[in-house]
Amino acid sequence: MKDRYILAVESSCDETSVAILKNDKELLANIIASQVESHKRFGGVVPEVASRHHVEVVTTCFEDALQEAGIVASDLDAVAVTYGPGLVGALLVGMAAAKAFAWANKLPLIPVNHMAGHLMAARDVKELQYPLLALLVSGGHTELVYVSGPGDYKIVGETRDDAVGEAYDKVGRVMGLTYPAGREIDQLAHKGQDTYHFPRAMIKEDHLEFSFSGLKSAFINLHHNAEQKGEALVLEDLCASFQAAVLDILLAKTQKALLKYPVKTLVVAGGVAANQGLRERLATDISPDIDVVIPPLRLCGDNAGMIALAAAIEFEKENFASLKLNAKPSLAFEGL
């Protein structure tokens, strides 16, 4: 039986990535060209800067991925690409490169939802058992997704305002931490105590929606008022208190979802899934009857490896796109 190879491209935000997947589950290469250093001085991602960086490095990423995988273009069976959600300019660069490569090598094109990629990064750990629930937590999204079968996603809960990763970066900026702030806040939180009271929005309500804008505002107000009064705040305790509130909200809504949708598997994925505090709370708060699957740290952030793992499922369903495929920056899963 011939080996199957899928080349995947990811460029939805500030990472340019090209990966190659063998036989639906073995990642032979996952090249990531990060732009974090370029955006640090701005305190966040600048779309125009991101697009320019993608243009500069995407061709090299293709070459490096093929070389690392030890294959040539003629060995490939398909090309997959993120077509949304994300920054429209950034998406278009990756899509143009993927479509040109697919056309030149007469390969089918597989369209992949970026968030499906995050979710299916869990396939790197084990083959998933359906139905399952997923908590997707990143800089742009916070959502609970019910997955009835391979490639069948439905949103059952999501944030009404800020995404959890966005809240981390905004409070990090207030504290003068380096962008992206999530990892540093997590590290500082482990050295502090939950001594400042922050709100846990809608934590007792039965619905599965999240809200982090009130928590973010409460944090900013506390910090501002302390500055005005010349009061000293303990940075480690601030981080510990903020993170405790975030995790209380995430865990409460996830547990409610598990009661409403009695599944045996919970996937937790996205950039914030790298958070050590979140991983610790999942280990202590989620029933041992639930199989909690979290992608390895190397697949939590944006990368093409996760896009390839999601694309393998779409390949089986023969979900191919024409070369007229356009970017969908606001692409979302279907809601219930």
Curated annotation (Swiss-Prot):
Subcellular location, record wording: Cytoplasm
Cofactor(s) essential for the protein: Fe(2+)
Residues given in the record as substrate binding sites: L136, V137, S138, G139, G140, D169, G182, D186, N275
GO cellular component: cytoplasm
CDD domains with a match to the protein in the record: ASKHA_NBD_TsaD_bac
Broadest EC class assigned to this enzyme: transferase
UniProt-recorded Gene Ontology molecular function terms: iron ion binding; N(6)-L-threonylcarbamoyladenine synthase activity
Cofactor annotation remark: Binds 1 Fe(2+) ion per subunit.
Binding-site residues for Fe cation, renumbered to this chain: H114, H118, D302
Recorded catalytic activity of this chain's protein: L-threonylcarbamoyladenylate + adenosine(37) in tRNA = N(6)-L-threonylcarbamoyladenosine(37) in tRNA + AMP + H(+)
BP-aspect Gene Ontology terms: tRNA threonylcarbamoyladenosine modification
Enzyme Commission code: 2.3.1.234
Record keywords: Acyltransferase, Cytoplasm, Iron, Metal-binding, Transferase, tRNA processing
Family statement: Belongs to the KAE1 / TsaD family.
Function: Required for the formation of a threonylcarbamoyl group on adenosine at position 37 (t(6)A37) in tRNAs that read codons beginning with adenine. Is involved in the transfer of the threonylcarbamoyl moiety of threonylcarbamoyl-AMP (TC-AMP) to the N6 group of A37, together with TsaE and TsaB. TsaD likely plays a direct catalytic role in this reaction.
HAMAP family attached to this UniProt entry: TsaD
Name of the protein described by the UniProt record: tRNA N6-adenosine threonylcarbamoyltransferase
UniProt source species: Streptococcus agalactiae serotype III (strain NEM316)
